[in-house]
Amino acid sequence: MHWADATSEKIMKKRNAEEYVVSSGITPSGHIHIGNARETLTADAVYKGMLKKGAEAKLIFIADDYDPLRKLYPFLPKEFEKYIGMPLSEIPCPQGCCKSYADHFLMPFLNSLEDLGVEITTHRANECYKAGMYNEAIITALENRLKIKELLDSYRKEPLADNWYPLNVVCEKCGKMHETKVTSYNSEDKTITYVCKCGFENTVQPFNGIGKLPWRVDWPARWNIFGVTAEPMGKDHAASGGSYDTGIKIARQIFNYQAPEKMVYEWIQLKIGDKAMPMSSSSGVVFAVKDWTEICHPEVLRFLILKGKPTKHIDFDLKAISNLVDDYDELERKYFELIEKQKTEELNDNENEKISLYELVTPKIPERLPLQVAYRFCSIIAQIALDKETQKIDMERVFDILGRNGYNPAEFSEYDKSRLEKRLYMSKKWASDYGENLEINDFEQAKEQYETLSEEQKAWLKAFSKEVENIEIDANTIHELMYETATKLNLAPKEAFVASYKILLGKNYGPKLGSFLASLKKEFVIGRFNLTE
């Protein structure tokens, strides 16, 4: 059983609710990266597991856009220093293209969720507070402030001040909330008095967006408001004495609500060279979800995140994304093989888990096994078939190349062609930005490389080019011919490969050579390998 199915089953047995609400959330203080997406996709996986079991369930996303800007992040202009302490929803867009700072970072993520196959109801904290959804919770918190203080102090080394109030007020003059302080609360007329460092002071009812609960009180309050029964959380929140531990007690003792079941997830680390660093919007170590959808299929991101348990950390290497796509393609082939097998045989647990995983990570399952052209090979084809002037890929050239590599384009469905074209453009961008950008040597560069070769390698190049004149060029024939001609001349095949890569790419290595040469025009291959003429 896949972990998402097991988790949803466990939650349903424990809660036995009429409706299950699975929640996810993020503070849009910077670029929302694939590490953040792990939370939302984990929630989505468990939600889908509940639906599969026939439960009434819904998936919600809470955007904490009423949190303040905490500091001047490295990606912000200096003039944004004046907005520190203001709610993210009230700060202008840093690039002037969106309604607010929060929207600038939030909207690309929300738009990408549809591509990722996530159907979710979004609640923006600023709208919820302004609409009065938190008013009752604010009153409850203020009237129980000493009890909340006692609960929080039991986890703190230094106790909160005796005059602490569980409320952050948005100053009505300067708009900041990090420099205000509540000095008193009147339970009769439900007003608070606050002062701000800007010099402003007022007595006001802290409702409809005037006041916001601090995180450790806001979180359990929202569980009650939205009826949350399950929620993924990072290991920092789930740590002993963390906000989940205090949230359990505040939810039960202050808001009379049972805390949701927790699903703890590990970080996704971005691998750069030999180092792997946790992604962080504030530090700038990010790979945004919108960036992913430009270089790879959304279902492959779901595969990366959902194939293993949430508690397993992931090292994500952009340079190795082709290997990840290969793994997804292998799962896809296995899925269709098992769908046929189960018509006549009973599948074992491992096989059933593969079916569950593919169905979970693939939002739109094709009717049959679609065309699969390896991602890395697509990156090569895309660069060869690219029209440099229009920057469009010549699909007829692509079909010609594939025909010489064992494919039959006449059998491609419209779905096959569409998916292939998407993979070509995505893999081309990946190769350009993160992978191997294929730059074939011009004639003069090839001549320079030719002069660095041994006499045996030069002789092989000439012999090979002569043989190519007499064959129909395709990947397998080319591969076999390289070995045959090298063997005849007593040249180690490895030396023949090195010679080929040098005159073509100026390197000692490169893509799979048979497929690469079959992707090029026959006349070009003959001319490039016979540089003596």
From Swiss-Prot:
It comes from Methanococcus maripaludis. One of its GO terms (molecular function) is ATP binding. This is Lysine--tRNA ligase. A motif ('HIGH' region) lies at residues 28-36. It is found in: Cytoplasm. Its EC number is 6.1.1.6. It is an enzyme of class 6 (ligase). InterPro entries: aa-tRNA-synth_I_codon-bd_sub2 (IPR020751), aa-tRNA-synth_I_CS (IPR001412), aa_tRNA-synth_I_cd-bd_sf (IPR008925), Lys-tRNA-ligase (IPR002904), Lys-tRNA-ligase_SC_fold (IPR042078), Rossmann-like_a/b/a_fold (IPR014729). Signal peptide: none annotated. It catalyses: tRNA(Lys) + L-lysine + ATP = L-lysyl-tRNA(Lys) + AMP + diphosphate. Keywords: Aminoacyl-tRNA synthetase, ATP-binding, Cytoplasm, Ligase, Nucleotide-binding, Protein biosynthesis. The keyword Transferase does not apply. Coiled coil: none annotated. Belongs to the class-I aminoacyl-tRNA synthetase family. A motif ('KMSKS' region) lies at residues 278-282. GO terms for cellular component: cytoplasm. It comes from the Archaea. GO terms for biological process: lysyl-tRNA aminoacylation.
